[in-house]
């Protein structure tokens, strides 16, 4: 029988303080996230479908804008409009039937990005993102479907290998600064 999904974009961004107030996050966890953001570490958010990965990434984006320099240039890449960024200097690029995320990541390098954010990595674009983050563009964030933090790193490696390369564990270790599950 027919089936379809309706994705409803959030009407507001819940800041990290909301996570603390509702007991979803401790003060120490929020401070760890803030520290990672301030130190421009790349953040990988993992979880299952509907677990709140994108909602948390929007909170992280909000914190990046709050803690960062007004001149920071954010490039947001996604296939479905879900990310919300209040930065004055941001550009959102979307996939099309003819342009995939891997192509967008490569194009992003010509846009002088300070922070590269991908809504969700699902394929070979993982390798391009890791390379971009590791070549002068730290401080990004993305999501991946995984059952725990270790599985998230393994999944990122599997996705990078879809580009036809061997395991990228060393690159992942050098590039990903924090995994949130």
Description of each model-found segment:
Residues 179-181:
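Short, well-ordered beta-strand core segments
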Residues 1-39:
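P-loop NTP-binding catalytic core
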Residues 30, 37-49, 55, 59-175:
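Switch/coupling sub-region of P-loop NTPases
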């Amino acid at each position: 029988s027919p089936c379809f999904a309706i994705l409803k974009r959030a009407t507001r961004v819940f800041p990290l303080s909301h996570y603390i107030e509702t007991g979803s996050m401790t003060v120490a966890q929020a401070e760890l996230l803030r520290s990672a953001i301030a130190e421009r570490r790349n953040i990988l958010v993992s979880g299952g479908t509907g677990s709140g990965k994108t909602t948390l990434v929007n909170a992280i984006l909000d914190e990046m804008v709050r803690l960062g320099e007004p001149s920071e240039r954010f490039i947001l890449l996604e296939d479905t409009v879900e990310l919300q960024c209040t930065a004055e200097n941001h550009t959102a690029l979307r996939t099309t039937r003819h342009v995939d995320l891997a192509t967008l990541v490569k194009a992003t390098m010509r846009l002088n990005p300070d922070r590269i954010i991908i809504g969700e990595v699902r394929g070979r674009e993982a390798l391009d993102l890791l390379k971009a983050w590791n070549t002068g563009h730290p401080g990004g964030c993305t999501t991946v479907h995984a059952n725990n933090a270790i599985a998230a790193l393994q999944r990122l490696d599997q996705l990078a290998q879809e580009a036809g390369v061997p395991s990228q564990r060393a690159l992942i270790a050098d590039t990903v600064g924090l995994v949130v599950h």
